[in-house]
């Protein structure tokens, strides 16, 4: 069986702290997988890393056969890798355009509309 999502040695470091330390994960296509652990264990950081909201320090992630390491969050969403959030918020490290694209339905039409909107408000 092929895997829809795989990570190999995925590491996220904040300062000197490894929030995720060389995580290997394989999710078979068509299967559900739960990620459980105590507060502060790195579950949300891991999800943020594979969806592109925090940069990885090492390792790689492959979704549906393609390396997603260089993709922006909205590009990962367009490929089908999406998530829900614990709270509604803007992402301070993303531009206004990228924040809008994260929320947009994954089509070129919405990218076009977001570009038009941002040009109208001069952002």
Predicted regions and their residues:
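Short coil-to-beta microelement around the adenine-binding A-loop and adjacent beta1/P-loop entry
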Residues: 17-18, 75
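Conserved small/polar residues in nucleotide/adenosyl-binding loops
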Residues: 121-123
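Conserved ABC transporter NBD signature motif
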Residues: 59-67, 79
């Amino acid at each position: 069986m092929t895997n829809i999502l795989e990570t190999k040695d995925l590491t996220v470091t904040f300062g000197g702290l490894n929030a995720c330390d060389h995580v290997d994960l394989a999710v078979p296509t068509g299967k559900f997988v739960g990620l459980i652990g105590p507060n502060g264990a790195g579950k949300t950081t891991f999800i943020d890393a594979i969806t592109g909201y925090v940069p990885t320090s090492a390792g790689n992630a492959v979704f549906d056969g393609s390396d997603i390491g260089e993709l922006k969050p909205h590009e990962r969403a367009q490929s089908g890798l999406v998530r829900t959030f614990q709270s509604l918020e803007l992402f301070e490290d993303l531009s206004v355009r990228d924040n809008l694209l994260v929320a947009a339905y994954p089509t070129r039409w919405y990218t076009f509309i977001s570009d038009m909107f941002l040009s109208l408000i001069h952002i």
